Regions:
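A short, surface-exposed loop/turn module that caps and links secondary-structure elements
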Residues: 29-53
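Enriched for short, Lys/Arg-rich terminal
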Residues: 2-7, 11, 19-22, 40, ...
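Phosphate-binding glycine-rich loops and adjacent basic patches that engage nucleotide phosphates
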Residues: 21-26, 47
Length: 85
């Protein structure tokens, strides 16, 4: 599957520490390569179909899997307290 990062999360990735951003991208690429596998620190989100969250330290990455388009789309990236609002 392809990995698509929306405009808002892309801006956040550009502003955070490069080492942290690269680590996040590496994890997201691994998920996009095999979304059906079990990945550490990933949980399905309630109330949103095909939506998951990845925990990366104090950061959360919310993404959706679109099996029809074969895309993993990152919709939100932020600190734990802000990403779920």
């Amino acid at each position: 599957m392809d990995l698509a990062i929306e405009k808002g999360p892309a801006k956040i990735l550009a502003r955070i520490q490069p080492k942290v951003a690269m680590s996040m991208l590496t994890k997201m690429e691994a998920i996009a390569a095999n979304p059906a596998a079990r990945h550490a620190n990933v949980e399905k989100m309630q109330g949103i179909k095909n939506a998951f969250r990845l925990r990366h330290g104090d950061w959360r990455i919310v993404y959706e899997i679109d099996p029809n388009l074969a895309v993993v789309r990152v919709t939100k990236i932020g600190p734990r307290g802000q990403v779920y609002r």
